[in-house]
Amino acid sequence: MPCGEDWLSHPLGIVQGFFAQNGVNPDWEKKVIEYFKEKLKENNAPKWVPSLNEVPLHYLKPNSFVKFRCMVQDMFDPEFYMGVYETVNRNTKARVLHFGKYRDVAECGPQQEVDLNSPRTTTLERQTFYCVPVPGESMWVKEAYVNANQARVSPSTSYTPSRHKRSYEDDEDMDLQPNKQKDQHMGARQAGNVGGLQWCGEPKRLETEASSGQQLSSLNLSSPFDLNFPLPGEKGPACLVKVYEDWDCFKVNDVLELYGILSVDPVLSILNNDERDASSLLDPMECTDMAEEQRVHSPPASLVPRIHVVLAQKLQHINPLLPACLNKEESKTCKFVSGFMSELSPVRAELLGFLTHALLGDSLAAEYLILHLISTVYTRRDVLPLGKFTVNLSGCPRNSTFTEHLYRIIQHLVPASFRLQMTIENMNHLKFIPHKDYTANRLVSGLLQLPSNTSLVIDETLLEQGQLDTPGVHNVTALSNLITWQKVDYDFSYHQMEFPCNINVFITSEGRSLLPADCQIHLQPQLMPPNMEEYMNSLLSAVLPSVLNKFRIYLTLLRFLDYSISDEITKAVEDDFVEMRKNDPQSITADDLHQLLIVARFLSLSAGQTTLSRERWLRAKQLESLRRARLQQQKCVNGNEL
């Protein structure tokens, strides 16, 4: 473990040291960032930092150094705070300078008060992000991060599990002890909000007594607080993230790894409750709007903790088996990549066999599933996203659990995924598109607010006859736009705003999908197990964990490989296409050439080759020929139904 735990348990003390040395000179801020950056470079240091993803909030010490793996769900308006402020001792008149960065509550002793008129006060700006755990993150990803984390934590003395669980009992106690409740609110009145920093005259007393007020505050909310997770059933903490530097580098839906100082000060809840009380004196309509915005933007810290960011990085991926940044020229990263690439061929062969079994013995469908799983939008030409490869697996058995168990297999392979059961009920009632709530001044999430490289599996086999209402039609349109243009149009009431995305869409259906797809492959099962669940479970249990991890590394790593086509091969492909057009002018089109080039690209990358070879081009033609022949055969059997 890194020597000296102060930077983990008392980071504000470290910051205070730099501030004391440099005073109002802004260099102290750069030195703080550099200090923590160097600390995290020490051997295995990041593993010793407690993570909000893995450690319950009540086990984390307030104002300790933590990390959080998250997606930016919303960005609030910038806020002003007191970067530097001065306190005056009421008895001795002694003046002390304090820093306000990385704090929600201003520090002042029992006999001190903030001098609001001090010429040395500095007002600065910070940005607030609303961040949620990565939507659809696979269980194996969570488990790997938990196993890697070596942070030693125990229940915090100021925020214990028993106190958290007794919230309703605390509320009853408050009713029975009105004098105690009155005293607490008297204490709260000594607090105030100045320049984005809460300040108080008796911080010790408020901190210890505020827990009951905090629970009362959360119980008094007009409705249960919605953590605004994009996907149903998601768990984990949402956080208000205060960003001080380079916030323009980040955007909504980015996946970030944050290192910063945890703020769960109970005083925040009392102060926010008081602000709601004060707003009730205003016009009723204005009061309602302000109260709703206040409720959303300043929720109880016990529900939505604050993180004051010291360091933040955008994550290329969330696969814990790979180095975080794959395009760095670090020797460690290069060694890992080159080592894995040297054994790529047997990994691909094993993965192909594994997916062939999962697809009931269909090796051609398994080939296309591999190509789909490593596909990614690598660039955009005008509005056209290049590299997307949506696959429609038709011929899936109806009234079977096959599609459900196939999704479970995919879940075990990719870092993040979601299965959308395409029923009339779901299409008509689920919220797909994020929309702006102007009353609360926040972006309300929808199912399609997903980070890059999420696998979205759409199961059409559950679709029955029925009527789509207007929201249902809008949802189908949203899915079509996502597949075709890799974008989601967020609803801002008065206008729509395009949010580009990079989502891998895989559609399972009985006949041809209602949705557009880049490629349709018709399933030809070679076996039909009498017990699908037992068959799929035995398939998963037969794979060694080490082999499964190789599959996971393979599918993530190949997305980031560069790819090119030499002039020589380009000429050969053009000549070949001209020859194909001569032989079959009716059915070979420019779209077919584009499809062949996409298949050839991902076929090459799946073999670890970053340039197209003649051999891979011929193999791509062979695969496409087999796929088209199978579709034609199915068309002959079922008429126009594919």
UniProtKB/Swiss-Prot annotation:
GO MF term list: chromatin binding
GO annotation, biological process: cell division; DNA-templated DNA replication; sister chromatid cohesion
Biased composition (Polar residues): 151-161
Compartments where located: Nucleus
Primary localization class, coarse: nucleus
Protein family per UniProt: Belongs to the MCMBP family.
Entry annotated with the keyword Cell cycle: yes
Protein name: Mini-chromosome maintenance complex-binding protein
Quaternary structure annotation from Swiss-Prot or TrEMBL: Interacts with the MCM complex: associates with the MCM3-7 complex which lacks MCM2, while it does not interact with the MCM complex when MCM2 is present (MCM2-7 complex). Interacts with the RPA complex, when composed of all RPA1, RPA2 and RPA3 components, but not with RPA1 or RPA2 alone.
Keywords, sorted A to Z: Cell cycle, Cell division, DNA replication, Mitosis, Nucleus, Phosphoprotein
The protein's role, per its UniProt record: Associated component of the MCM complex that acts as a regulator of DNA replication. Binds to the MCM complex during late S phase and promotes the disassembly of the MCM complex from chromatin, thereby acting as a key regulator of pre-replication complex (pre-RC) unloading from replicated DNA. Can dissociate the MCM complex without addition of ATP; probably acts by destabilizing interactions of each individual subunits of the MCM complex. Required for sister chromatid cohesion.
Region (Disordered): 151-188
Keyword flag Lipid biosynthesis: no
Annotated positions of the Phosphoserine modification: S154, S167, S298
Gene: MCMBP
